[in-house]
């Protein structure tokens, strides 16, 4: 929206909500805000899909397939998340719903919307992620049968 409206909305949030004082506010237009939201959620969907594929590859290794302990995987993800560029979110396999791949209401909806919005098909990686996740959710494996 316009700068004045954004400032007023920011003050309303700061003065009448539980938003912490350290929360950053960005004044931008609707298109940019939408692109940020879809970019974040589709990136997280890619991260979940990637981690599920890594999990399968890791657990298929003969040493770990004989002894697949959750503690070993947790130590692996702890090492990954120690790199601040990776971070600790969306590394859990299976996910918080106890299933493999991403689910819930946001990530599947947003990746479909972003793919649909991409009329020039620049985001082909998202189509691959959606296909892999569908396979993971159905079978627990990212390889087509």
Residue ranges and their predicted role:
Residues 1-145:
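Structural/interface elements that position substrates and couple domains in central-metabolism enzymes
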